[in-house]
From Swiss-Prot:
Modification sites for O-(pantetheine 4'-phosphoryl)serine: S37
Annotated protein name in UniProt: Acyl carrier protein
Source taxonomy: Bacteria, Pseudomonadati, Pseudomonadota, Betaproteobacteria, Burkholderiales
Keywords tagged on the record: Cytoplasm, Fatty acid biosynthesis, Fatty acid metabolism, Lipid biosynthesis, Lipid metabolism, Phosphopantetheine, Phosphoprotein
Protein's gene: acpP
Subcellular location: Cytoplasm
Function: Carrier of the growing fatty acid chain in fatty acid biosynthesis.
Length: 79
């Protein structure tokens, strides 16, 4: 597991109040991890803070799974 993947999974677990072991790549925030719309907004904000990026609303709407979040962070993070 890459450093970015581990950081993303930790943030998701903390934001959604689930065990890190439940946060696997294929999981959907809403369907599998019980997130609501406010949770997803807070999750995007936490990812922005962690990786020093700004996620436009149109991109945020596409980040619906753990893997989407990992891929976005890998592509856009500032080293």
């Amino acid at each position: 597991m890459s450093d970015i993947e581990a950081r993303v999974k930790k943030i998701i677990a903390e934001q959604l109040g689930v065990e890190e072991g439940q946060v696997t790549s294929e999981k959907s925030f809403v369907a599998d991890l019980g997130a609501d719309s406010l949770d997803t907004v807070e999750l995007v904000m936490a990812l922005e803070d962690e990786f020093g990026i700004e996620i436009p609303d149109e991109d945020a709407e596409k980040i619906t799974t753990v893997q989407n979040a990992i891929d976005y962070a890998n592509t856009h993070h500032k080293a």
